[in-house]
Amino acid sequence: MHSTNNNSNKRNNEEKHKQPEIDSSANNGEGTSGTRAQTVGDTATEAGVRNETEAGASTRRQTDGTGLSGTNAKIATASSARQADVEKPADVTFTIENVDDVGIMQQKKPPTVVQSRTDVFNEQFANEALHPTTKVIFNGLDVNTEVQPLSDDFKQISDPKGYLTYSVKYEDQFTKKDKLRASEADDRIVGPTVNLFKYGAAVVNIDLNRDFFDTATGIDLTKGIPLVQDLLVPIGVTAGAEQSAEYVSGLLMVLFKVMTDNRLVIVGETTTPMSNTLSTVVNNVLRTTYHNNVGVNPALLRDFTQVNWLNRDITNMLQQAGTKYGLGLTETRLDYVRLVKTIVGHALNIDHFAASVLNINLRALMEANVTADDRIKALQAHSMISTQFHGPNQGALRPELAFDHDHIIRCLMLAAANYPRLEGIIVQINTGYVASANVIRPVSEKRYFPENLEQNQSAARLVSAVKARASEADISSIHLAIAREVSPMFNVHELKKIAESFEDPSSIVVVLEFILFALFFPTEFNRIKGDIQNVLLLFFSRWYPVEYGIFVQRGATYTINAAGEFEFSGRNEKWDQALYLSEHFPALFSDVPLAGANTIIAIMRLFTPQGFLRTDDLAIAANFPRASRNPQTYIPYTNQRGTVTNEFASRFRTIVATLANVVNERAVQDDMQKATRSCTKQWLRHLETQFDNIAVAHTDHLSVVYATMSNFMLNFTNNFSGNHATFKPDQYVITSPEGSYKPIIERQGETVDGLTIIDTSIVWPILCQCTYPLVRQSGKGVDAVSIMEEIVYPDPSTTLSQSLSVAQVLSKLTLPDAFINMILSGGDSVVMRTYQTEADDDLDEGIRMTTYDQYLSHIRERLHITNVPDPIYITGASTPDQIAASVQATHVAVVLYQSGVINGPASTYLRENEVLVVMPDYYDVVSRFANANLQMNNNRYHESVLEIADIFDQADFIQTSDAVRQLRALMPTLSTSQIRHAIERIAQITDVDSTDYGKLTLRFLGTLTRSLKMQNAQIRRIRPDGTVLRYDDQIDIEAFRWSRYFLDELQLRRLSVGLRLITNPRIARRFNGVRIMYLTDDDPDPDFVPDVPEGYVAVQYAHRLFSSSLANKRNRVTYTHPPTGMAYPSPTGRPHVHMTINERAGMSKLVADNIIASVIKSNWVVDILDIEYTAEVMTPSEGYTQHVDAESIMTAPKGKLFHLQFMDGLLRPEPSAFDPPASGEDMRLIYPLQPISVARSMRAIVNHNEVDRPRGAVAPSSYEMDTGTLSRNGDLLYSPVANGQVGIPKLEVDHISFSNVVSMMTANIRTGDDMAVERVNPDDVRAINIRNA
């Protein structure tokens, strides 16, 4: 391990055990973000146009290299610097030097991110500001590089808000002003609870917490239910259905908020209670320490409420088995290596839904098992090949989420489909790295021509032709061209237009330009080779018209058939770049011999690439996302150290010789002057010398840069195979079940000059106006002497940090798509029957079956999307081994019945492995199985729903699929545009603007191009003709087999909790059916359902029961009584009827009025079953704030969701002698068909006769007060009712608990810290072997 004496000795002399100052950020409150601000860093240290002489360049030190050749610079980085404000760039100064009368502008560059953090780290170390454990770990280590967390998407808080809270409605007449006396110490604990649940509370409800579901989400909770406008906007529904859409939208927003709840709880301010100052009751519930913000729980009313009956009830519940309430510290976990606390558990007054998510977050973080080696591998993948790292493993003290390769690659693919400009962001990161590597830079001296070039008319034309193509050296364009070579492509590229007639021999310059471009940039050349063919064909038609005619007769394009044979078109057609992704290839690059076109073939062979495919080995080791099972990158050339001759230079000599012959032949044919041939050859020989000089820089330095960048995290697609004749990029799309898809590579993408519009003339300044460190070292630069310019090894943390920031932004940008995709896809199911085959079978035991109709309409559609092989057909001869092989190969537990009687062993296998058998129908299924199954009966089956995810052996979401199905049943049918609107609405509340580089990413990405219906979306390859291909586990990566809704494991686990929250009856509060009955209501009870009196005749509503007839000289609505057939034109005097209305569709207002009149005048009882409504309980002092009459209910359109208010008159004030007498009775028409006070926790917190319990008063549930336990696997459990038993998981029942154990991090856990390591750069860049072992 390398070390630096200065730092090491200094650190060894530090006092190791002195307590440092505690970072105030460790005790931040709710809303304090643990997401770190990041700076862009010095990503383009050489960006901009700089024309330097070699002498001027030699005076410049590279400030961004951090590691120089064979040395280790002493640079320490501060973890806490990442928490600071975004760094401000230092002032830029300029100096002018006169070298050979050329003005040179040099920039004094601002310090890099690493350099800025160096000072902070050293200062903290010297001033005792580092955690003592951290100091011990880093003693003796020469820290010169930082490694940031690979996945840090948590927000640290110390005072967590719950999802649920108590809301109280008071009746002022009963409120007592005197407060129960409690000691000051007790009051700190019980005060908030006593003050909330005070005497005179009419009702206490459990509601969603406004403080958590803030206004930024757009959730309106004024009616006790979540309502959101403008999320789901159904089109074409009848008026009045908006409320239903708002309600479902509210549930979706609540669910999304829970799914994205990334809070981590850190230990906040705590108190150690002094028992002698507290009452016995309080002492009994407090642990050794407790959080200062105690919160509210009914258990704290014990002995402190003035309501006697309530005190008795709570006391009895807390004393019974199965209810254990506590407050404060429950457990402590230690790092046994360093003997420091890491995790503590605290019993808090918070609902179990929020507590579950908080525990899920911390558990995911602590169980990820990410080591220092994992971070170092990520850093190594962004470092120059052969760089070594040394760093300590800090274990549990620096936890982070595991880098989810599968999830990130799915998000990258979805983001690429949505944002084609993502290509530009990745190119920008790569460009910054090339710039910081200082591998190439321009000089003022231009070497386009030999010094002794002949001075004649032919030479003048040549110079003019070269100058027409060779532009001034633009270093940023050169860096971009290099970076583009290994970057993913999400837009089809095009050649920048070239105007050339090829009438003059000097026009060979354009042909040479193309060859040089193919040599320097073979990947980019392949992307635009079709456009280049158009130019070359014009050249051949002018210079070799006979050969050209032969060539186009064979065809200008070809395809490759299934046998791998080339099939030429036989047409002379101009290439269109839209064909690049098609099955067509430009024929010039077929490398197929053609008799009579030898010159064309000879010239085209000069375009053959000379590089090699390199496996992205470091990216694989770092578990970086890659879209291929065999991730490789084509490197244009390889290092040549140890070879006698440089193959790259030799290749150019071959090119020069070939082109010299071409020009010579052309000159002879056209009887050109000797001077023309002479000056051209002289120029080509000059270029050959130039190429000889720079070849070593490309093969021994730039090749290492390419190999390094090939491992970068965001270079996740294979770039090129090295064969222009056969290569087509893998084309992936995001599919949907309706047959549409969104391609990853846009055929008609944005045209951006330099990014997608390619200028091949960039090769001229690379060849003739640039210098390289290795060229200067060789003495072949303009200095004419050897200058030992140091090789720069760029800081890898800059590009890694930027890549992680982009990945984080893209993951968040795709989250709304993923969320809606899950809602529309999750819970997909098919109806099946389970036929019992044994006498003692339970309902779900037996052989599973469904029909072809079900299979075709549900499963088959999904099979197409997931593109697995077809299941096998089974017959009477099928064996268990054959069935097992099919299930293993297809990953689908489905077989298709074809014929015969299924034998006994096969039947047993189908039963034991829960394979789904697809039958033609259910007719006499017993006859299709062996007689050995004597217990099987055609009528002995259980019909149920089978999750499609279960069929596919991908049971990621089984536990919540029922809840998803319930939610989907409430949603209106949505078009693609409506789904897109919902996604964009959710995106407005998605926090993606987290880092400095993230902000740049957002600005650059531009407008979203989202045209796909996100439902059952999957990632699939397509053929060049657009045919969607089945998933192929020999080609496609495992991450593409199943999209997992584009959500990661942590999001799915939170989502599971959120679904249980919104489907909990006490929160959902959606009801069906009301009873219309005319009764007095002097003492209103919201849950009262009046009984149907005896003797009433049950009648099902039908339109035919009501007609129009003439009675008393008027047309009247006449009711015909089914039992007797008697007609009753008047609502008065009709028989006692209990009418049930299952479907109101088509009911006229006249009939509705007539039925209501019958309720009032003939005491009918009418049950309306198809009405849906949310309910709100009102108190006497509130009164009704809105009114819905019975007629509106009966005539409302289908889909309308009512909001009904019901009065709770239990605490209606007694009238005084001075109140005027009532003039009549209170009458009521509308009653619920089931209790609607599901949200209620307590009712009537008053004493009757100062002591007794009022009739109908309700105490809180014991479940609300039961702290229970936190199991080893992270589940919150209720207390067991008996010793030796295990408590019920709180999430599996509909009860709500407001006392739960929450795991918290101590200050010893530093999730937001970078990890400092020692980086050892290679001794010699030319000794690096870039070929894989």
UniProtKB/Swiss-Prot annotation:
Its main location: virion. Transmembrane segments: none annotated. Residues 11-21 have a biased composition (Basic and acidic residues). Keywords: Capsid protein, Inner capsid protein, T=2 icosahedral capsid protein, Virion. Coiled coil: none annotated. Signal peptide: none annotated. It is found in: Virion. It comes from the Viruses. GO terms for cellular component: T=2 icosahedral viral capsid; viral inner capsid. The keyword Transmembrane does not apply. Residues 22-42 have a biased composition (Polar residues). It holds the Pfam family VP1_protrusion. Residues 1-10 have a biased composition (Low complexity). Residues 1-71 are annotated as: Disordered. Inner capsid protein that self-assembles to form an icosahedral capsid with a T=2 symmetry, which consists of 120 copies of VP2, with channels at each of its five-fold vertices. This capsid constitutes the innermost concentric layer of the viral mature particle. Belongs to the turreted BTV-fold inner capsid family. Homodecamer; each decamer is made up of two conformers of VP2, called VP2A and VP2B. 12 homodecamers assemble to form an icosahedral capsid. This is Inner capsid protein VP1.
